[in-house]
Amino acid sequence: MNLSRNKARKVKQKRLRAKSELSRAASKPRLSVFKSHANFYAQLIDDQKRVTLASVSSLKSGKYGGNVAAAKELGLLMGQKILDLKLETVAFDRNGYLYHGRVKAFADAVREKGVKF
């Protein structure tokens, strides 16, 4: 029990540390990802104004669920939404997740659309 509490505490600290580093680069909007076992979510957040500029989720599309194919499709959708907002660069917030699997597929798909991190 104590081991899982320590692990959860370390993950939370890691996320907060990454978020504080990203908020220093406040000139760019933050592209934040969240993954559950069943779905994948992403938001484009303007930390200065504290508003969400765009969002996508596999829950809304309902095609694939939370697998790598869904993450790639959502990445293409988010890349198009970012370009529609006339933004070229964003700060990518992995939210403490490893850059692997669904997170990597999402990021690569956003980059395919021409958005720079």
Curated annotation (Swiss-Prot):
GO terms for cellular component: cytosolic large ribosomal subunit. Residues 1-23 are annotated as: Disordered. GO terms for molecular function: 5S rRNA binding; structural constituent of ribosome. It comes from the Bacteria. Keywords: Ribonucleoprotein, Ribosomal protein, RNA-binding, rRNA-binding. The keyword Lipoprotein does not apply. InterPro entries: Ribosomal_uL18_bac-type, Ribosomal_uL18_bac/euk. Residues 1-17 have a biased composition (Basic residues). Transmembrane segments: none annotated. Pfam families: Ribosomal_L18p. GO terms for biological process: translation. The keyword Transport does not apply. Disulfide bonds: none annotated. SUPFAM superfamilies: Translational machinery components (SSF53137). Part of the 50S ribosomal subunit; part of the 5S rRNA/L5/L18/L25 subcomplex. Contacts the 5S and 23S rRNAs. This is one of the proteins that bind and probably mediate the attachment of the 5S RNA into the large ribosomal subunit, where it forms part of the central protuberance. Belongs to the universal ribosomal protein uL18 family. This is Large ribosomal subunit protein uL18.
